[in-house]
Amino acid sequence: MLISSLQVGAKPYKVTSPNGRISATLSLDKTCQLSILLDGEELMAASTIDLILEDGKQVYSQAKVARSKRSSINEVIEAPMYRQASFTFKANQLDLKLQNGFGLIVLATDEGVAYRFYQTNKGATTIYNEVADYHFGADRTAWLAYSTNKEKPMAMAFQNIYHETAICKAEDQIAFLPVTIDCNKAKVTLLETDIVSYPGMFVRANGNSLKAEFAPYPKKMDYYRWRGMSYVKETEDYIARHEGTHSYPWRILAVTEDDTQMPLNNMVYALARPNKIGSTDWIKPGKVAWDWWNDWNLRGVDFVAGINYDTYKYYIDFAAAHGLEYIILDEGWYDSNKANIMQPIDEVRLPELIEYANEKNVGIVLWTVFNVIDEKLEEACKHYAEMGI
């Protein structure tokens, strides 16, 4: 481990992956910039990254380094309910602690590069924006999943197809992560993890780059009469606020030379916050037959398909016959207009349905609006657990 102190942040810092192929270069000169190479070939040109405080102050531009520390990571991570029981995570890491009470970590693995900002001072901090202007080149092909809400782009279900487009020809609207860019020698996928008290990242194509955008902090909430779902009615002019020390989300740029490597990349899991709930033995993962997927439409049956006992009984039979561990009761099993999850509709005959599912060794998952269950979390979980959910 090498530690140095009180350096002016003008010199570039380089971090290289354990296999020596991937490297990240960080500069804290006029602006804070990060670039990425694979075997010496540029994947991402120098790209500005920063946090913006009140009055537009940039935390990392021309910042002075109080301490730089290099270290290597080599740890076995237990991964219950992952595609493997455990995996080994290796990385080389640079940790820069600044004189202004902030810091920055950059690490390189054989699977890509990641960075995160952090704060060491203990006062109240308001983040007005985060800068992430990733320069890949105007002609680079990107796969973007755009927001489906034109009126309120950041309020949507994060469900869309991916559009293949040159960055310079992309639509002028935000896309949600993951986003993948073809950089010729390899593909780079933008990801994030360990997001606590902070908005998720969107990106918008901007010439030759993908520029991050973030939802502003809610100022005033309201409820839709239908569903009882809360929504943001008015926002602040900042994106996050917190007290004391804080670690900001990891920004991950996963590097893959073969598309089959994409779903095997472990960086999101490895850099996520460690398990805080203790034992996970009570969690039973599994596949599910999902009513919403085909809108309850069943053909060739001798009953009226819909949100009712016979339909879900049919789903249970299907799940049992095909080795699926669960069925989902999506929206409609309780009256959405009343937004009371303690009162299932009579047509579902939930107690009978649970009994039938238990006989078939199929579990039931109940879908709800997020804030509706939050408001009765302990009561609802206790009630339905006692029923056999």
Segments predicted by a language model, with ranges:
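An acidic-aromatic substrate-binding cleft motif
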Residues: 239, 243-318, 322
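Compositionally biased regions
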Residues: 5-6, 18, 359
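Short, low-complexity intrinsically disordered segments
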Residues: 141, 224, 248, 280, ...
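Substrate-binding cleft of carbohydrate-active enzyme catalytic domains
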Residues: 285-389
